[in-house]
C-alpha cells in the first residue's frame, strides 16, 4: 500500500515541478485557475513542498521496512 502512495506522490511531484515557470511567474499566469497569480504561486509552492516532504518520508519508511 505504501508503495502505491509513494509512486503516486512521485508522479504528482514531477507534475508539480514541471508546471513551475522558470521565471517565477508560475502556472497561474497562463491560466487564471486560482484567481490571482500570487495566490497560484503560493498554492503551487505549498503543494510542491508538501509532496517533497511526503516523498522523502515515504522513501525512508519504505527503506527501513525493506531492511528488516
Swiss-Prot record:
One MF annotation (Gene Ontology) recorded for this entry: protein-transporting ATPase activity
Pfam families listed in its UniProt record: SecG
Membrane-topology descriptor: Multi-pass membrane protein
Keyword Protease: no
Subcellular location: Plastid, Chloroplast thylakoid membrane
Lineage: superkingdom: Eukaryota
Transmembrane segment boundaries: 1-21, 44-64
Name of the molecule in the record: Probable protein-export membrane protein secG
Amino acid at each position: 500500500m505504501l508503495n502505491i502512495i509513494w509512486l503516486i506522490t512521485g508522479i504528482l511531484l514531477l507534475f508539480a515541478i514541471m508546471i513551475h515557470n522558470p521565471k517565477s511567474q508560475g502556472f497561474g499566469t497562463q491560466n487564471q485557475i486560482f484567481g490571482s497569480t500570487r495566490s497560484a504561486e503560493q498554492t503551487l509552492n505549498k503543494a510542491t513542498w508538501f509532496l517533497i516532504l511526503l516523498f522523502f518520508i515515504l522513501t525512508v519508511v519504505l527503506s527501513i521496512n525493506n531492511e528488516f
